[in-house]
């Protein structure tokens, strides 16, 4: 069989599967993120029995959409689909990849290949943090531009972010959350040996029992990254600013630094 004939049959097979997906209502929402390549990736995740059904959007951003999904055992999952056509996003992520030894040998021929690498970077960061005991969603799988992880929420709704929930909390509860936030930052740096890079009230979920979950770790870099200290200082400033200006707590930067500085010195990272 000639190559052209093989390609034609593959295209027909893909179109047939796409129609079947829509006909069987495996997708409840079809948006611009579902280009042909992304549909193929979703199909492959279904073939591997990782996903059974995609539901509605949990959250949206400039670079991705997160959907509620279900696995073959009925377990709820969060599916993050990165947009592969965002040129602006491509520019914004270079500073996190340049200097990362995990990407030294990778060559990005186009925006899609870069975004795929970015999705896999988040999966690896999630796995590393999860194994280090950081409170993050459990990573399940990553294929092309799609990341599958544990869903954290109730009744098909994700847990609220710190920025969404803090106004309903007491001063004592906010003090408790500040301590938890510092402890998780310490675990990210000292146990996972990473810097989050965007540690803020927008990337911390609050559970009903006031436990926290750290999300959006794609930009996290290793401590050896040339900009690691700069990113860490920014993370600390983000937390300090929020708990002082928004939560109105009487705290000091040193309360955050004191938890991290000893292990930075131990790992040979100069903090000043």
Regions inferred by a protein language model and the residue ranges of each:
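Short glycine/proline- and charge-enriched loop/turn segments
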Residues: 103-109, 157-168, 214-222
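Long, low-complexity intrinsically disordered regions enriched in Ser/Thr/Pro/Gly
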Residues: 1-17
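Conserved kinase catalytic-core helix
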Residues: 110-138, 142-143, 158-197, 202, ...
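A glycine-rich phosphate-binding loop feature that marks nucleotide/adenosyl-phosphate handling sites
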Residues: 145, 203, 259-261
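C-lobe/activation-segment region of protein kinase-like
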Residues: 170-181, 190-196, 207-272
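Conserved ATP-binding subdomain of kinase catalytic cores across diverse folds
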Residues: 31-159
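Short, glycine/acidic-enriched loop or turn micro-motifs at the edges of active sites
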Residues: 83, 153, 201, 206, ...
